[in-house]
Amino acid sequence: DYGVTADGIVGPETARLLGINLNDQASNDLYLIAKCVYAEARGEPYVGKVAVAAVILNRVEHPDFPNTVYGVVYQPWAFTAVFDGQINLEPDETAYQAAQDALNGWDPTYGCIYYYNPETATSEWIFSREVVVTIGKHNFAI
């Protein structure tokens, strides 16, 4: 209807039509959170996608982590998707919606700053964290 191909990817033209300005910091944060959500939680239920976004935002507010979305996402070894390059995939509309819901204050993790898949996690340290909630395949912890 708007001359945009429905391919599930929000590129620059689609973002423009959705009213997302990729040139301001809030939009850059939304885009980066959506990229991380898409890369880290593609197969998870919607609430699990929002939860991943919420963890990013909780880290931004936590004194033990960088105080920017960029700093949190690109902190060394913080996210598998950065290490393996999946962060470079273009997010779909659902990832944007999940990121926006978290930015609007929805935190299904109740303040968690960690998450992991217990079936694939390789760091023994992560298993020492107190699990607050499990959503989909991820444990969310403090």
Locations of regions flagged by a protein language model:
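Intrinsically disordered, low-complexity Ser/Thr-rich linker and spacer segments
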Residues: 12-30
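Bacterial extracytoplasmic/cell-wall-associated proteins, especially those involved in peptidoglycan
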Residues: 25-142
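Short acidic, glycine/serine/threonine-rich helix-capping segments at coil-helix boundaries
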Residues: 1-16
